[in-house]
Amino acid sequence: MRKLLLAALICLSSPAWAATDVWLFYGWGPDGWSSGIDQIARRVRTLRGVNSVHVYDYRETQRAYNEAVAANHEHSLVFGGYSCGGNASLAVAGALAHNSRTAHVIALQPSIWCGRYPTTSNMRYFQDTWSSGTFGLGSYMPEGPPAGYTVFVERPNPHGAADTDPLYQRDAVFAVGAVADPSRRWILERHLMRTAPHVDRQDATVIWRRE
């Protein structure tokens, strides 16, 4: 188990000298309904190795895509979002496959109602924190060409409270931190093992965890 986790976290790694650019997307509705994304953004901006953090409406995928295409090719790219914003992250990261850009995606309760975007082979790491009891609002688990490594984390939180839940926020912040500064990836490893210790299934590229 520990060896598999270490292999997964190696997929998060980028050269220590490379900066990381981050795009975060709000969920459906007024931005204030996704206030947890602003909280995550504030924490992510303080992480070592993070170069820039952009926070957008989930519909601003073209803007995020254009900025990512123009970003320094030595930078790592991370896309994250809550609800429809998680789907937006998948959409932008997947589109970057046509530009031969790798990406990391961190989704918090992506929705089955906001577009069924697949994982793609240019995604070095995909992390999906989801909940089954949300009438589909926060239970989308994408399929597709496998990402470098995929982690599904089931946390049974109501959809409306997921973005502000401390564990959901730590899932996102620690994952960004592991990309931006590989020397700190052990923090994500420890967090997942402690807070989602039960493993339902796993193979070489995917693990399904739950609390």
Model regions and ranges:
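Sec-dependent N-terminal signal peptides
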Residues: 3-12
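Short glycine-enriched nucleophile-adjacent loop
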Residues: 89-97
